[in-house]
């Protein structure tokens, strides 16, 4: 039965996950299941870990092997019940009230739909190097714990910023990402252009670092500048992705 559970290959921080099932030929489905279990794991704590762990045990506690697509659908259904769509309210996705679970769920959904979300129009071919690079980064995304909420447009910029926001707009979902405390410290009070340049340097490997939020990747990929209009549009797009994750 333990073959259905993710294993952390390296517990020192730069970890990856492994997952064994009897259906090795279904690589794409197994990867989706592994990513979903990883999302549930990083969202858990020592207190809540066994909630999703027990959900998985209930599904695989059978004499017959469980197909990975059935296991994923069943596990996601149980998670949907634990986090019902009715609790997903845009006004509550703000800096002061948001449950970090929604950021994890959003990153999983962006990973799952990465090609269609980063492609433009009906063309199945990436439009430029930035899009191709973003899809590649999303493909290799790894869920990690120890995340904190960061403002894209900072609360107290280190230098003069032409973007002036009311507190409600600054703290809204469209202006938030969830990253590590280390990256948060490095980026926290930088203006948008500096943050985007730093993320670009992560992408082209000119600076050490990684993309810790697919929501952030999407924002920086499609917005060369940051404005109240861009914040609202990004927030609406991300909220729509969350809603569609229940379909």
Identify the role of each PLM range.
Residues 1-247:
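Flexible coil/loop and intrinsically disordered segments
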